[in-house]
Swiss-Prot record:
UniProt-listed Pfam families: 7tm_1
Protein name stated in the entry: C-X-C chemokine receptor type 1
Membrane-side (Cytoplasmic) residue stretches: 63-76, 134-154, 226-243, 311-351
Predominant subcellular localization, coarse grouping: membrane
Glycosylation sites: 3, 182, 194
Signal peptide segment: none
Cysteines paired by S-S bonds: 111-188
Gene: CXCR1
Membrane spanning residue stretches: 42-62, 77-97, 113-133, 155-175, 205-225, 244-264, 290-310
Subcellular location: Cell membrane
């Protein structure tokens, strides 16, 4: 019979998603989850690519926004915080990559810190995007500018988003530690004693309810009414000005929604609402790893969106280059005229 009170009896095999939930069948034996060496190195190369792109891209985004003090909008302040969250997370990717090869060799402190940064990145991202959706909803649907133009209030909202993200992520910092199971590589894992399985389910369900589902519903509500208002009023220029915001939200959902859906399925399986088998466990573990990598990719995609869609971002970047003599002022002036004529009305002033 599976003994959940003795962690030494578990066979993790490096599976970071294992919850220790015992199966109902007493004759059931733990599944052996295998990881191919090729897959490990593909993951490492992917992490390295995301790290480099995120480090360069988000640093440029922060530089451009911080340089543009005069034309900085409320949305820009939110996107600045979004870039900071992605940058902090990117700094942990080399550690995650190394753990794919040798297991978790970095000790309990780094286990807590990098797990905290990963969760804070996710929660702050969706909370900030929810705040942007509310800001755009007030500005377009209700034509409210008093709240959206007070930047000092926006700073307090951002601080609140970071604080709530820290609270939602705090259990990972408190309970995760470096653990060395028998006959397996060390892992960074939540350890809560005999009730690890039960509490891990609680720690999984509550944060994702308040840190993902609720903000997602807020975004769907706000952007639904915002789009309805834009199309109803035939506000074509304002709609074009919202392209960056919509693209950022869409990319976030495409990157993180699959992981959360697989995680929800895994939760149903762990709580025996879906029958668990070795084959399903292997499929879920592979899906979790693949969709988590997709989520990691999100940290480097926003700067690419700004570069291709955000005219203000391109102009701000060229302005910095011109200040340092890397491009001519004539070229900057021509680019500014082109940008102005192609989008003469800028409702959100976002990047």
């Amino acid at each position: 019979m599976w003994n959940i009170t003795d962690p030494q009896g578990w066979d993790y095999d490096g599976d970071l998603y294992f919850t220790g939930m015992p199966p109902i069948d007493e004759d059931f034996s733990p599944c052996k989850l295998e990881t191919e060496t090729l897959n490990k190195y593909v993951v490492i190369i992917t992490y390295a690519l995301v790290f480099l792109l995120s480090l360069l891209g988000n640093s440029l985004v922060m530089l451009v926004i911080l340089y543009s003090r005069v034309g900085r909008s409320v949305t820009d302040i939110y996107l600045l915080n979004l870039a900071l969250a992605d940058l902090l997370f990117a700094l942990t990717l080399p550690i995650w990559a190394a753990s794919k090869v040798n297991g978790w060799i970095f000790g309990t402190f780094l286990c807590k810190v990098v797990s905290l940064l990963k969760e804070v990145n996710f929660y702050s991202g969706i909370l900030l995007l929810a705040c942007i959706s509310v800001d755009r909803y007030l500005a377009i649907v209700h034509a409210t500018r008093t709240l959206t133009q007070k930047r000092h209030l926006v700073k307090f909202v951002c601080v609140g988003c970071w604080g709530l993200s820290m609270i939602l992520s705090l259990p990972f910092f408190l309970f995760r530690q470096a653990y060395h199971p028998n006959n397996s590589s060390p892992v960074c894992y939540e350890v809560l004693g005999n009730d690890t399985a039960k509490w891990r389910m609680v720690l999984r369900i509550l944060p994702h309810t308040f840190g993902f589902i609720v903000p997602l519903l807020v975004m769907l509500f706000c952007y639904g009414f915002t789009l309805h208002t834009l199309f109803k009023a035939h506000m074509g220029q304002k709609h074009r000005a919202m392209r960056v915001v919509f693209a950022v939200v869409l990319i976030f959902l495409l990157c993180w929604l699959p992981y959360n859906l697989v995680l929800f399925t895994d939760t149903l399986m762990r709580t025996q609402l879906i029958k668990e088998s070795c084959e399903r466990r292997k499929d879920i573990s592979k899906a979790l790893e693949a969709t988590e990598i997709l989520g990691f990719f999100h940290s480097c995609l926003n700067p690419i969106i700004y570069a291709f869609i955000g005219q203000n971002f391109r102009h701000g970047f060229l302005k910095i280059l011109a200040m340092h003599g890397l491009v001519s002022k004539e070229f900057l002036a021509r680019h500014h005229v082109t940008s102005y004529t192609s989008s003469s009305v800028n409702v959100s002033s976002n990047l």
